[in-house]
Amino acid sequence: MIFFFLPDLIYLLDLLDLLVKNSSPVAVMSIFFLVRACISASAAISFIAVGAPATGPCVEFSDRLPNVKRAVCDAAQLQPSAGKSVKGQTLWVRDVKPLNPNLRVLIVGAIHGDEPSSAAVALHWIGLALDAPVDTPQTVHWRFVPVLNPDGVLAQPPRRVNANGVDLNRNFPTPNWDRDADAYWQRRTGKDPRRWPGPKPLSEPESQFLQQQMESFKPDLIVSIHAPYGVLDFDGPSVPPSRLGRLYLDQLGIFPGSLGNYGGVHKGVPVVTIELPNAMRTPLDSEMRQMWLDLLRWTAERIGAQPGKLPRAP
């Protein structure tokens, strides 16, 4: 392809002037149309190469998530999964896997679309996982799903529920879901549309995707990031962490169809639910790092110390 910059254009005009002085009128017109076509093609190609909008998740995520500069998102190197949202948005994942990992941990953000700080923390933690502190006693295969509910995150304004109006954190197949989920929604929430559990368990592609991840990845621990209650919740076996950073343990109970109930109580996989203090603003970078280091230490001490926690093929 031919590209014209200013010096080239000046040279071309000088050459054209010389040709005009020494050519017939027909030749001059032919030269004119040829030059105009070349310049037009060059301009179009330059726009495609330089000015065309970029694609990929970071274009939208860096605009919608707090404290997520484009460089932070790009460095995470999110990979497309086979999962899609109701509206066909790709569900992006990132695996950070050392050699011979001892444990597998699944970290999920933005189950609720109006809690974008949860996705932002997950993206920052990918960068910390890639740094892999040398003093960590356990090596962990991390799988991140930073935005489980992209339709909710990208809605204007962001919405807790997915595009079908379902609260994904009430859509998991806990025992007696058919009996309990709708009754809880009607009696305890007053039919709050932001907490509708859906028509049946796993009715939504996003909750189906996460359940499939649990079945195939077989995590030893699930970390679910939410906001804005500013506490830690825990469900399942093992001793819960007393704190992560400035967040202290305050177990909130279980709900029909919740991830904590399904994973921690029903499936026996420890589920740490992090409730950040603000849904629209992340903690300071130093605080996010401290939360991460505390999570590493607790994971090594409590999850890694459990009998039978040996590497398994995912």
Where are the language model's segments positioned?
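Bacterial N-terminal signal peptides
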Residues: 32-46
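Short glycine- and acidic-rich boundary segments immediately preceding or forming the N-terminal edge
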Residues: 47-91
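Conserved beta-strand scaffold positions in the cores of enzyme catalytic domains, especially
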Residues: 79, 93, 144, 222, ...
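Active-site/substrate-binding loop(s) of hydrolase catalytic cores
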Residues: 102, 106, 116-251
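Active-site-adjacent mobile loop/cap segments within catalytic or ligand-binding domains
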Residues: 231-235, 241-245, 257-314
